[in-house]
């Protein structure tokens, strides 16, 4: 298995884990009604949970399961695009469109992996490459 294949597998596994967590949380949107500060409500209007520390409720509501699932879906599109051309993503890419596409998508996928740098399976060699 090549390094790029391992990189794709690592990011896919993290997205799968995140999806499982979002689905376990109900998979739906949350909101913070202005009339009840500190409460986060689900789509039906029921209190999903409450948090009395000012400001956290809005941040948490923006990280709702539905939004997380949307982000995961778009991340998978990028990951699938990269997987098609990952073999062309090398330290010294050719100067053609396909290699440039692979290199650019590889940069994005490496950034996605770097979000999980604290994970025991993360490899430092997956850090994004910077070239001039």
Regions found by a protein language model. Name each.
Residues 1-57, 73-80, 112-132:
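Extreme N-terminal leader/activation tails
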Residues 5, 9, 62, 99:
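Charge-dense, low-complexity intrinsically disordered segments
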Residues 19-22, 64-101:
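Amphipathic alpha-helical oligomerization segments
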Residues 33, 60, 64-67:
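Short, well-structured hydrophobic secondary-structure segments
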Residues 89, 94-123:
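Short loop/turn elements at secondary-structure junctions
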